[in-house]
Amino acid sequence: MAQIDFRKKINWHRRYRSPQGVKTEHEILRIFESDRGRIINSPAIRRLQQKTQVFPLERNAAVRTRLTHSMEVQQVGRYIAKEILSRLKELKLLEAYGLDELTGPFESIVEMSCLMHDIGNPPFGHFGEAAINDWFRQRLHPEDAESQPLTDDRCSVAVLRLRDGEEPLNELRRKIRQDLCHFEGNAQGIRLVHTLMRMNLTWAQVGGILKYTRPAWWRGETPETHHYLMKKPGYYLSEEAYIARLRKELNLALYSRFPLTWIMEAADDISYCVADLEDAVEKRIFTVEQLYHHLHEAWGQHEKGSLFSLVVENAWEKSRSNSLSRSTEDQFFMYLRVNTLNKLVPYAAQRFIDNLPAIFAGTFNHALLEDASECSDLLKLYKNVAVKHVFSHPDVEQLELQGYRVISGLLEIYRPLLSLSLSDFTELVEKERVKRSPIESRLFHKLSTRHRLAYVEAVSKLPSDSPEFPLWEYYYRCRLLQDYISGMTDLYAWDEYRRLMAVEQ
């Protein structure tokens, strides 16, 4: 196992215009302060205020948006980071681990990773993801990529259909089809930060949001040693070269994770579990009393000093005894949140320290709060109650189905852009209006300038005389559409769908 030295991981250099020379502790901290400014002032963060956490198109400001959720995750991440550093200081290990002059950057990387962790999520959350992937699967059929004979391939896009005698090209076709059918919010976050927003963050800061290490074009089983880390796609084919450079800069082995990402993940797990239940009470899906009984029933028998007793029962009893001065709802969730944090944060911090050799190497194949402990059971309790009583509620399911229909419908509306030939689309990009393609011209005008420029830049770097050129061009055209639609807020996607479907407002 390699020696633990965080100076080799907290890399303050950037992809472009990187600071040069040896830096003092204060200068390094200023570099990460610059990252904070770039992130907090980015449009991608602002858009989170109109993407909802559980309840799409919610008008009640007390119910969490992705932005308010991310701010809560940021605070919990800061708490865990400080707890880790405090414990390492007590153990007199800060200097041994190369952290004595990097405590500020350590905290900042964790905080900003937490704030950014949802920036790649499409409108309507997981149902938006599912809509994008299902729509592309119905056209590209990635499951036919190994089909024999090749004539069994059902892909409806001619340039991506497998052909006899073109094996090197067929392998690229397989990768592209698989990649496009595995849109994922975390992978889109990497694409946003590097390719679309060009935020030019430090290598360490980007490493903090590389939550999953599986390429989106991966086919087959994942290695058992990295099964958890490769649970979902973490980056696209379009960012393959950037991620290869990132791994080199952060000393990450293939499919390994950046150490501070485990802290961001734990902060998210702690935050959303309580928040989803609080939002459900705010939405009147159940009362606080009903929630307490759901939690009690799901946990089962327990001793007086059990974690359930110390966290949930304690919150319930305190909220009832103080109900005259403040509402039971506010009291209950205040105590539940405080009790949960006071138990889970120190536990997550100690798990990080206990497993630091594997975490530093990027190979710890678990979440910090997924083990056989009572702390893990408490998180599972919150999640299971939310799944059973919140996500399955008719109002929530109806909104999710509407969201799925909106995203599918928008992709269908913009499909003519994908149906154009390479030469026709190239002409449209150059001229921005083609008389013989009036519908396509108008659809193209609606695309964001930032996304169009990303497409143009990517295609301009391709050798136009290569047999791979038509494949890559179509890939980036699909990315253009996915970038545009996934970047919409819930409300904008809803309104855009209604406008283009000529539905009365």
UniProtKB/Swiss-Prot annotation:
Its EC number is 3.1.5.1. GO terms for molecular function: dGTPase activity; magnesium ion binding. Residues 66-273 form the HD domain. PANTHER family: DEOXYGUANOSINETRIPHOSPHATE TRIPHOSPHOHYDROLASE, DEOXYNUCLEOSIDE TRIPHOSPHATE TRIPHOSPHOHYDROLASE. Homotetramer. Belongs to the dGTPase family. Type 1 subfamily. This is Deoxyguanosinetriphosphate triphosphohydrolase. It comes from Escherichia coli O157:H7.
